[in-house]
Amino acid sequence: MSSRNNPARVAIVMGSKSDWATMQFAAEIFEILNVPHHVEVVSAHRTPDKLFSFAESAEENGYQVIIAGAGGAAHLPGMIAAKTLVPVLGVPVQSAALSGVDSLYSIVQMPRGIPVGTLAIGKAGAANAALLAAQILATHDKELHQRLNDWRKAQTDEVLENPDPRGAA
């Protein structure tokens, strides 16, 4: 997370508590990479005033990237992007009704002038959003750049050391 001495550089927000089952994968990546982050439920539909306040104060609060996850109508990422210049990465949360395709379409089809970087549906999208946010931050942070490089190497080494899909022999 973050502390007074190490303020959050990234915010992870989601439309409801149930979205945490997906968005926790972004937080896990930040914990591994030691990226200070803030986590909060900000509903586009249930708490619109909170959404506006959050987005309008994002830059002032020191956020350099916002990851917004939402399911269903999934207006959260786009509405945040409309109210801030901080880059927004949208994560479509998989829903029971349409398997997250509805969320994907809501996030990816933004009008010209209000960009949202859209990731994959579900857990992979949440993890990749965190990795992409870390890569953005690493353009001006050599230590984070090295941690990302080490993480990628460990990922590669794990595959090379365990090539048998059946597990240990």
From Swiss-Prot:
UniProt-listed GO biological process terms: 'de novo' IMP biosynthetic process
Highest rank taxon of the organism: Bacteria
Record carries keyword Isomerase: yes
Top-level EC class: isomerase
Molecular function via GO: 5-(carboxyamino)imidazole ribonucleotide mutase activity; identical protein binding
Disulfide bonds: none
SMART domains, alphabetized: AIRC
Pfam family, one: AIRC
Catalytic activity: 5-carboxyamino-1-(5-phospho-D-ribosyl)imidazole + H(+) = 5-amino-1-(5-phospho-D-ribosyl)imidazole-4-carboxylate
Any one GO cellular component localisation term in the record: cytosol
Protein residues bound to substrate: S16, D19, R46
Pathway note: Purine metabolism; IMP biosynthesis via de novo pathway; 5-amino-1-(5-phospho-D-ribosyl)imidazole-4-carboxylate from 5-amino-1-(5-phospho-D-ribosyl)imidazole (N5-CAIR route): step 2/2
Keywords: Isomerase, Purine biosynthesis
Quaternary state and interactors: Homooctamer.
Reported function: Catalyzes the conversion of N5-carboxyaminoimidazole ribonucleotide (N5-CAIR) to 4-carboxy-5-aminoimidazole ribonucleotide (CAIR).
Family: Belongs to the AIR carboxylase family. Class I subfamily.
Listed name of the protein: N5-carboxyaminoimidazole ribonucleotide mutase
Natural source organism: Escherichia coli (strain K12)
UniProt lineage: Bacteria, Pseudomonadati, Pseudomonadota, Gammaproteobacteria, Enterobacterales
Gene this protein is translated from: purE
